[in-house]
Amino acid sequence: MSDSAVATSASPVAAPPATVEKKVVQKKASGSAGTKAKKASATPSHPPTQQMVDASIKNLKERGGSSLLAIKKYITATYKCDAQKLAPFIKKYLKSAVVNGKLIQTKGKGASGSFKLSASAKKEKDPKAKSKVLSAEKKVQSKKVASKKIGVSSKKTAVGAADKKPKAKKAVATKKTAENKKTEKAKAKDAKKTGIIKSKPAATKAKVTAAKPKAVVAKASKAKPAVSAKPKKTVKKASVSATAKKPKAKTTAAKK
């Protein structure tokens, strides 16, 4: 009995630690939610004071410069924030910007005068000009890279072409040698054929030349009697004339 009583008395003592742990977890959850809410509230819904002041001066476009009141009014109207709470930050920025050269103070002293943007600040504030400059630089860089790549590729192609040309020359030379060999073989064959063919006409020519002298000799023999016949005629004429002349001599002798 005493043991059961001790067990029952011990059980209620062990229960409180679980409830304590639950409370601690709830507190941590509530604490994390509170910190998240604080962080959400701490993040501003407007850009920093530097950007707001520069934008207000740029968009107001006042010849004599924009005053502190005009800047505050512009900030409250466009960004919908309390410019009175931001006034110390605005004044601090105006003073530092005048010292740095981002702003030019046309009137007054400190943060109570009128302010204009400097030429360097105007150039910095033009996003279009920045983008144009960046795009131009990128184009120049891309052109340089492209020209380098083209130069490398042209060198590679030139080397490849130089490597290919000797091979082509070798192939052409081998083709030419093969063709020359073929032509030489064909010429040799033709020479053999022509030798065989030419020998036959030579033999025929020899026969013709051998036959021609006989004809010439025959012609000469035929012509010789004609030549020999002519002198005979002349001799006869001479004899006739002699015989004719002889009686005349006789007559002259008779006259004596």
Curated annotation (Swiss-Prot):
Residues 245-256 have a biased composition (Basic residues). GO terms for cellular component: chromatin; nucleosome; nucleus. The keyword DNA damage does not apply. SMART domains: H15. One of its GO terms (molecular function) is nucleosomal DNA binding. GO terms for biological process: chromosome condensation; chromosome organization; heterochromatin formation; negative regulation of DNA recombination; nucleosome assembly. Its main location: nucleus. CDD domains: H15. Residues 1-19, 27-43, 194-229 have a biased composition (Low complexity). Residues 1-53, 108-256 are annotated as: Disordered. SUPFAM superfamilies: Winged helix' DNA-binding domain. Keywords: Chromosome, DNA-binding, Nucleus, Phosphoprotein. It is found in: Nucleus; Chromosome. Belongs to the histone H1/H5 family. Histones H1 are necessary for the condensation of nucleosome chains into higher-order structures. This is Histone H1.
